Amino acid sequence: MEKEENKMEKIISLAKRRGFIYPGSEIYGGLAGTWDYGPLGVALKNNIKKLWWKKFVSERDDMYGIDAAILMNPKVWEASGHLSGFSDPLGKARFNLMFKTQVGAGEEASPSYLRPETAQGMFVNFKNIIDSFHPKLPFGLAQIGKAFRNEIAPRDFLFRAREFEQMEVEYFVEKESWQTYFEEWKKEVEEWMEEIGL
């Protein structure tokens, strides 16, 4: 394990020296689990997002791109089970990983949450897409966006951060054909990852 940690430290050090990524708020002591992308990191990240969008949205006739809000009505998170089940163990208790915030001021303020994933934004807009574009199954919704998780112990560089970006597709199919489409998507994603050198 020590060898793996040493390797990760070397990768982080190289990425910082070369201008890819820096610890967030570093000149003020940092904030665990937050990272700032430097000039080369931003360029790399934007190129990956552009290639992903081209492959999985622009070049397909069955995909609709959206950009859903980061803040959503708390009922969304209640209905999806995030309020009761999106947690990590903390001793004998459970710790909800969602960042809680307030919308509005003073006594009029109401609770809200920073989204912990992008999927729910696509699900709540499903009917809007149906009403606007009338797609037939199969079709998908795609989104690239920020997500936030109040990690108990952020670690492993970018792999367990408090703020991160996701590139996500929700693909809707007839129940009996899910396995066929799952295998097709799995193959497409593997091919794309190979194309970009992962």
Question: What kind of region is each of these model predictions?
Answer:
Residues 2-198:
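TRNA-recognition modules of translation machinery and tRNA-sensing kinases, especially anticodon-binding
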